[in-house]
């Protein structure tokens, strides 16, 4: 069972959320262009993980337009962000200080170039950064080759789908891999999935699935037998259905699980996260929906075993589990932290102000007031910040926002 530790109100709509691979840190990108990093409480001496305060490590106006996507590097020391201002910036996770940046490749010709807004960023390895854009391009950047900030060019560019890339899931490295890093990944976009190789480019495109594919996750450790290898790709669609794809059989789906049975056709499944094995019964995925609910689906029996509500109106944009097994859900103007329930006590509500935090204060230290910035190039451009509502919100059915920031205690009946 899980309860909310707290609900953290945000100053503007959440566009992207990233969870640190080894530390209790969460970073977010907002529609206002701000990027903010939080430090979650460490386990207390009495063993109650997750109780305490969530501190702002740093907060800054990183992009002049909306911050579309954020993502940590493989080792967690670097936080990448990309915005509608056409810039990708790499900052130190601990301080927020920008170390280098480069321009998103533009589209058009000599008669007129325009920004191709980013929609997804992912560090595949210490050497390779993947960046997807609204035009459907998927760029590969070599992080070892840092040319001047304006002239940086991708090593490769692919167009795996007719539409923009809605999700990206790396495939596990092969048994013969010497680096230990993935060299292939699966993307969803439009009504298809595609498999791309670091060296050979696009390998496979699936058949048209007849519905928009939005989210994905890769699950290992399933029961093998017959043609099943015990590994499946889980894909979330716009009509409330999860599809399962057998490893290596990427041309068409293998199984279907109806997650949302709404009378109007089902809510779209915006984001998928694998529940840590120690928290679930068997293999379980958490699915964030456009109506603000999170549903938990057990693979094998292929059924929904529990659900909770992140928000009554706004959809779930970010979902994942931190290094201590706490679930982090984000959407609308709130981020919520959930821990495995120990008692019926409510978590403490963090009413921290939405102030700017100057870098260099260290993890977990909060400075109130001031207008410090961790990026010398940052300035205000409120007119640009409001132009990018459509991409993230186009599948949302609810309107309005939950401004209360109150604590909501929910239980997972199937996960205790």
From Swiss-Prot:
Keywords noted in UniProt: Nucleus, Repeat, WD repeat
Main location (coarse class): nucleus
Family matches, as Gene3D superfamilies: YVTN repeat-like/Quinoprotein amine dehydrogenase
Compositional bias per record (Basic residues), positions renumbered to this chain: 389-400
Bias-annotated ranges (Low complexity): 166-179
InterPro entries per record: WD40/YVTN_repeat-like_dom_sf, WD40_repeat_dom_sf, WD40_rpt, WDR55_POC1
SUPFAM superfamilies: WD40 repeat-like
Record-level GO cellular component terms: nucleolus
UniProt WD repeat ranges: 9-48, 62-101, 112-151, 214-255, 264-308, 309-348
Subcellular location: Nucleus, Nucleolus
Segments for region (Disordered): 149-183, 343-416
Stretches with biased composition (Acidic residues): 343-359, 374-383
Family: Belongs to the WD repeat WDR55 family.
Name recorded for this polypeptide: WD repeat-containing protein JIP5
UniProt organism field: Coccidioides immitis (strain RS) (Valley fever fungus)
Gene that encodes the chain: JIP5
């Amino acid at each position: 069972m899980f309860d909310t530790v707290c609900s953290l109100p945000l100053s503007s709509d959440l566009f992207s959320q990233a969870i640190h691979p080894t530390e209790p840190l969460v970073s977010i990108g907002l529609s206002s262009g701000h990027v903010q990093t939080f430090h979650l409480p460490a386990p207390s001496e009495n063993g109650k993980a997750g109780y305490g305060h969530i501190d702002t490590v740093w907060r800054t106006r990183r992009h002049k337009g909306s911050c579309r996507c954020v993502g940590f590097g493989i080792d967690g020391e670097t936080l990448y962000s990309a915005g509608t201002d056409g810039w990708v910036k790499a900052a130190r996770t601990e301080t927020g200080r920008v170390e280098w940046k480069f321009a998103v490749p533009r589209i058009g010709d000599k008669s007129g170039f325009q920004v191709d807004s980013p929609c997804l960023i992912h560090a595949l390895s210490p050497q390779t950064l993947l960046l997807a854009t609204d035009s459907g391009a998927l760029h590969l950047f070599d992080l070892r080759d840092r040319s001047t900030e304006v002239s940086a060019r991708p090593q490769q560019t692919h167009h795996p789908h007719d539409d923009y890339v809605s999700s990206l899931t790396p495939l596990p490295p092969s048994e013969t891999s010497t680096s230990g890093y993935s060299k292939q990944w699966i993307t969803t976009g439009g009504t298809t999935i595609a498999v791309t190789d670091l060296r050979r480019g696009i390998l496979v495109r699936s058949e048209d699935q007849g519905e928009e594919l939005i989210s994905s996750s890769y699950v290992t450790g399933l029961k093998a037998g017959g043609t099943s290898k015990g590994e499946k790709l889980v894909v979330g669609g716009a009509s409330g259905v999860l599809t399962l794809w057998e490893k290596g059989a990427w041309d068409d789906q293998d199984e279907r699980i109806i997650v949302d049975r709404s009378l109007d056709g089902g809510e779209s499944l915006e984001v998928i996260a694998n529940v840590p094995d120690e928290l679930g019964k068997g293999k379980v995925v958490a699915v964030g929906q456009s109506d603000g609910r999170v549903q938990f689906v057990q693979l094998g029996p292929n059924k929904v075993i529990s659900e909770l509500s992140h928000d009554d109106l706004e959809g779930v944009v970010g979902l994942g589990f931190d290094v201590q097994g706490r679930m982090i859900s984000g959407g609308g103007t709130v981020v919520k932290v959930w821990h495995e329930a120990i008692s019926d006590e409510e978590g403490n509500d963090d009413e921290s102000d939405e102030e700017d935090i100057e870098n260099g204060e260290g993890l977990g230290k909060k400075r109130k007031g001031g207008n410090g910035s961790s990026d010398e190039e940052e300035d205000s451009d409120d007119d640009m910040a409001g132009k990018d509502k459509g991409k993230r919100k186009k599948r949302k059915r609810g309107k309005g926002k939950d401004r209360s920031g109150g604590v909501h205690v929910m239980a997972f009946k199937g996960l205790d």
